[in-house]
Amino acid sequence: MASMTPAEMARVLGSGLLSFPVTHFRDDLSFDETAYRDNLGRLADYKVSGLFAAGGTGEFFSLTPAEIDRVLRAAVEETRGRTPVIAPAGQGTALAVEMARAAEAAGADGILLLPPYLVGSEQAGLAAHIEAVCRATALGIIVYNRANAQLDERTLAGLCERCPNLVGFKDGVGDVELMTRVYAALGDRLTYIGGLPTAETFALPYLEMGVTTYSSAIFNFLPEWALSFYDSVRRRDRDAVYRELRDFVLPYIAIRNRKRGYAVSIVKAGMSAVGRHAGPVRPPLTELDAAERAELTALIGDRR
């Protein structure tokens, strides 16, 4: 069982950088639990405020429910209560409810509720989906606002009134006006998490809108760099932040944007570049080509 209340979990998450580890696969695309556990042990040396197991960077979309349970239980066992472990839930409402209950049974500290699969919906439908998951578990819920599941501030405020365990809002939209309206309406009722791809890009301006943390995929292969960058953001050291954006993050994004799906593929390529092979990505994702891998390795350079 989770050792934190939902409110306590949310406060902890908002206090530091968040880790979104990749999921390790063998060459035959099966889950490599030993390598996954070894990697979590390595990353445990670096202080983060939360670990999101089997999230987007962890290829949630390609994992079976049984595999998600294995990944999650491995993360809970390896962190040994030192770091809150957040589990994924998604797809349709019935499956999301099952995932949330399974995560609670596995010892997770919270749930990241991903958008429903494909279908578009009105605000009332999204609210019903989220409320059903909140009522299915005592764990704290973080709603992931993105794609086909974009809440407005009125819907979110109503959910917060009805669901005390709705404690987090992760933004994957990048709508500054919406974020301003949400924070103006709800203030510290929620913990706000930056969830755009390569979230470092938006971390400094988002800090001014109450977004005190973000999920760092780069942490997978450059943990010291990622923590240093986060520290610069929290200190509002504009010179340091924009130097690293110019010299590393923006060139990294240029590689990431070359093909669809590279937001995950480039992270595993980065791990290989620093000698921490995490195996292939699962279809429908594709690997970086040899020239792109060489370019990424050169960009990482002595930051490893």
Swiss-Prot record:
GO terms for molecular function: 4-hydroxy-tetrahydrodipicolinate synthase activity; 5-dehydro-4-deoxyglucarate dehydratase activity. Pfam families: DHDPS (PF00701). Its EC number is 4.2.1.41. CDD domains: KDGDH. The keyword Lyase applies. It catalyses: 5-dehydro-4-deoxy-D-glucarate + H(+) = 2,5-dioxopentanoate + CO2 + H2O. Keywords: Lyase. Pathway: Carbohydrate acid metabolism; D-glucarate degradation; 2,5-dioxopentanoate from D-glucarate: step 2/2. It comes from the Bacteria. SMART domains: DHDPS. The keyword Lyase applies. InterPro entries: Aldolase_TIM, DapA-like, Dehydro-deoxyglucarate_dehyd. GO terms for biological process: D-glucarate catabolic process. Belongs to the DapA family. This is Probable 5-dehydro-4-deoxyglucarate dehydratase. It comes from Methylobacterium radiotolerans (strain ATCC 27329 / DSM 1819 / JCM 2831 / NBRC 15690 / NCIMB 10815 / 0-1).
